[in-house]
Amino acid sequence: MVKKKAKFRHISINKKKFYFYEIKWFDILGDSGHASSKEFDAMKPALMTTTGYVYSKDKKYLWTFASYDDETFSDRNCFPIGCIKEMKKVEI
C-alpha cells in the first residue's frame, strides 16, 4: 500500500512558499488592582490560538501574517518563541 504524502495549506509569493499554521501560545496576564493572595495565586496566562502563515522563525522569534497581496504582508505578528506552546501545520 502506498502512503499518500500529506498536503499542507500554503501560498506562494515571489516563488517562496508560506505554510498555514494553527499556533497555540500563552498571553501574559496583568492586573493593576489590589488582590488577595488567593486571587494572586489564581492568576494564569491565557492560552490563545492564532492561525496564519509563517513568514519566518528563528531561535528567538516567530513571525506570522494573515493577509497579503503580490508584494506586501498585513495582519502581522512577532511571537517570542518562549510563549509558544504548540504549532500545527494545517492540512488541505
For each feature predicted by the language model, list its residue ranges:
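Conserved RNA-binding domains used in RNP assembly and mRNA/RNA metabolism
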Residues: 2-92
